Design a protein with these regions (language model features):
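Non-catalytic terminal/linker segments enriched in charged/polar, low-complexity residues
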Residues: 1-149
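P-loop/Walker A NTP-binding module and the surrounding RecA-like catalytic core of P-loop NTPases
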Residues: 118-121, 147-368
Length: 368
């Protein structure tokens, strides 16, 4: 893939123009800032390609919409990951006629998948209109129409993270313990480093030694610098990291914050303090405030999105652990009730199992 630094205009890597743009790599947009090569980090990795990296896009097999090989592999993993959610919904369409019973079964299946009452009602209302317009007569056709409706509902969530409008771009990451926050930051670091971005990590999760160590491992693996302080003040660590990022000409500063529940008011206030202190270090920062949510938690994830957004003003989401859950419908609930962009979704432990979110791909993988 081509790097981001030095691009003179906003650019989506490996993007395909149009609604069904499929990106082989994470879609990271380089903003118009153009030239922003910082100081080189010491000790460049001996081998630029780590063993757990997916192979570069190979020649795609002939098909209507050529997809890079890596994205084909991703689609297969996404489909497998969403099978639990998808099968309960697609089973509704195995009958021979379209009647009230079909719609009732579909309503139950969508609610069981944690789609939520509002999104379920909206999808069913839209589906009945589509069925009428298309004069559809068999359930298989209805399933295809539902996939179209779901893709349209999810469309507002599809957005690329923009890097390069500010130097450094400061990304603050929050999430409850167990959501996969630190791992997601590690994977994001790998993506950014692979796209020639100079990254600095801030271990502001100072309470959990394991979190600092985990982040340290990712820093070593990706040959990026890390600002860490045992038992230090999280806000102070964040301030130091942003200041260091500016001084060292970094492209991105990623701030890992302590995992917490939205009900822990004093901890939420601490997050707000970290955000304020980041702004003191850089008046325009943080440029992104991301929340990592566990897809397995279903409707609970939606409550987290609402609570963290109220406290911090979220700019994007990373939805992890969508593999093996029966609650993949939660993305539709988020789209209906709190449409904050989903920058990445995860369906596994591997680095390549975190990819950019594409509404149509997701709908097809779920209902295919």
């Amino acid at each position: 893939g081509q790097g981001l630094a030095g691009l003179g205009r906003t650019h989506v890597l490996h993007g395909v123009v149009g609604h069904q743009a499929l990106t082989a790599q994470p879609a990271i947009e380089a903003a118009p800032a153009g030239q922003h090569q910082g100081d080189a980090t010491p000790a460049a990795p001996a081998s630029p390609v780590a063993p757990d990296l997916p192979p570069p896009p190979a020649s795609p097999e002939p098909q209507a919409k050529p997809q890079p090989a890596e994205r084909q592999g991703w689609m297969a993993r996404l489909k497998a990951g969403l099978r639990k959610t998808g099968s309960s919904i697609t089973n509704v369409f195995t009958g021979t006629k379209i009647d009230d019973a079909l719609y009732e079964e579909l309503e139950d299946a969508l609610l069981m998948a944690d789609t939520g009452v509002k999104a379920t009602e909206a999808l069913l209302h839209d589906l009945k209109r589509r069925v009428k317009e298309a004069k559809a007569t068999d359930p298989a056709a209805v399933k295809a129409l539902l996939a179209g409706g779901l893709a349209d509902l999810l469309q507002p969530l599809e957005k690329s993270i923009v890097i390069g409008a500010h130097q450094p771009t400061v990304i603050m990451v929050a999430g409850v313990n167990g959501a996969g926050k630190t791992t997601s930051i590690g994977k994001l670091t790998k993506y950014l480093a692979d796209h020639d971005q100079q990254v600095l990590l801030a271990a502001a999760d100072t309470f959990r030694a394991a979190a600092r160590e985990q982040l340290g491992v990712w820093a070593t693996r990706n040959t990026v610098e890390i600002v860490s302080q045992e038992g230090g003040d999280p806000a102070a660590v964040s301030f130091d990291a942003v200041t260091a990022g500016k001084a060292r000409g970094k492209d991105v500063v990623l701030v890992d914050t302590a995992g917490r529940l939205p009900t822990q008011l004093h901890l939420m206030q601490e997050l707000q303090k970290i955000k304020r202190v980041i702004t003191k270090a850089d008046g325009s920062a943080p440029h992104e405030v991301l929340l990592v949510i566990d897809g397995n938690t279903g409707q609970n994830a939606l409550h987290q999105v609402k609570a963290f957004d109220e406290a911090l003003g979220l700019t994007g989401l990373i939805v992890t652990k969508l593999d093996g859950t029966a609650k993949g419908g939660v993305l539709a609930a988020i789209a209906q009730e709190k449409p904050i962009p989903v920058y990445f979704i995860g369906v596994g432990e591997q680095v390549q199992d975190l990819q950019t979110f594409n509404a149509r791909e997701f709908a097809q993988a779920l209902l295919g």
